[in-house]
């Protein structure tokens, strides 16, 4: 496959600071807390793509104001509610905030500043990454139609993160435990015929390796893939596009 006839659309959004209030807290797995925010400031909120990221702005107990990137997991325009899923890293300030979050607590959101809208009518969709990619993968699978063909490869060593995906697309799901197993699983895929889109997100060095596998071994067209580093070992608040 050397080309694609489908077109990814990039759109920009006007950025607003939105003051919101915590109205719900859930823990879908041992390593994630889902926090639902509400507020009139969400009336004109827009998230056009499953892998959008917004800035979550919060204060630490010491009074330091921090910003972290999060995927808009679920948005209800009628109720004006927005849910974010926080990964519970051992010493992360955003994780610490989520652990102590309570109804009525205030926070500020900004963005998304733009969306990369990937058509849903590709012949197949590959979604691959580590646990950090799970909120985006869950959202994409919920949005794909029943006719879509989805292949999912996720790296997480914790079985509690291996939640069932709610999707009309009935995806082919493969769970692995280590970065090397993630690379090997994607390398070993027999990708379907037709035009497909490969979306991958996770730790920076692993995603660089995964991108190389897609380009050199699967001959995936560069215009039909998106690879993002959601985090990097030893670096806080990291996000980088790794597209070829």
Feature locations, PLM:
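Extended, composition-driven regions rather than compact fold-specific motifs
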Residues: 1-244
């Amino acid at each position: 496959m050397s080309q694609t006839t489908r077109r990814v659309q990039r759109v920009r959004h006007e950025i607003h600071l939105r003051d919101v209030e915590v109205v719900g807290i859930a823990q879908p797995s041992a390593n994630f807390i889902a926090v639902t925010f509400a507020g009139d400031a969400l009336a004109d909120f827009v998230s056009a793509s499953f892998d959008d990221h917004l800035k979550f702005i919060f204060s630490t107990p010491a009074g330091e104001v921090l910003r972290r990137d999060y995927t808009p997991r679920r948005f209800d325009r009628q109720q004006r509610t927005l849910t974010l899923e926080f990964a519970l890293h051992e010493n992360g300030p955003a994780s610490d905030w989520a652990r102590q979050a309570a109804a009525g607590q205030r926070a500020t959101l900004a963005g998304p500043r733009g969306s990369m809208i990937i058509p849903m009518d590709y012949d197949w969709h590959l979604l691959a990454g580590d646990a950090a990619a799970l909120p985006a993968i869950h959202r994409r699978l919920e949005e794909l139609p029943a006719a879509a063909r989805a292949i999912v490869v996720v790296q997480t060593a914790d079985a509690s993160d291996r939640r069932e995906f709610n999707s009309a697309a009935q995806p082919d799901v493969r769970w692995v435990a280590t970065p090397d197993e993630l690379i090997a699983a994607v390398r070993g895929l027999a990708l379907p015929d037709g035009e497909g889109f490969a979306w991958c997100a996770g730790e920076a060095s692993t995603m660089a390796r995964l991108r190389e596998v897609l380009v050199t071994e699967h001959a995936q067209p560069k215009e039909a893939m998106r690879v993002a580093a959601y985090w990097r070992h030893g670096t806080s608040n990291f996000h980088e596009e790794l597209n070829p």
